[in-house]
Amino acid sequence: MKQRKTKRKKTINQKVKNATPNIYDGIEFKSKLETYVYKQLKAHNLKAEYEPIKFELIPAFAFCGKKIRAMTYTPDFVGDNFIIEAKGKPNDVWPYKWKWFMWYLLNKGLAEKYKLFVVHNHKETDECIRRIQEL
């Protein structure tokens, strides 16, 4: 009897699911939502960079002679006083990294500098843009 191969469902650290990459203004976005956020920021003359900096949340270290990689987080959009994360469908690691990122900002004295926004759709993006304009 022939054995059937079954696909194992990936559960650990899944990357972007069901996202459609886009290129707009020469920038390669990972999803349509990120492209929409960028277009809205640009339409409202709000200055923000796309994935400009990678924050090292936990530095690399050695454990029992084995190198452990640093844990990093790259926000989607960073402006002078705001950070926007466009999250269509969160993966399994997202909630932890977001908490560590907030902790990082707090401990580096940056929590007062940045207002954090997480958007999941166009409606939330539009509301986010409105709130940023009020800052």
Regions found by a protein language model. Name each.
Residues 1-135:
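Electrostatic, structured charged patches in enzyme active sites and in nucleic-acid/phosphate-binding
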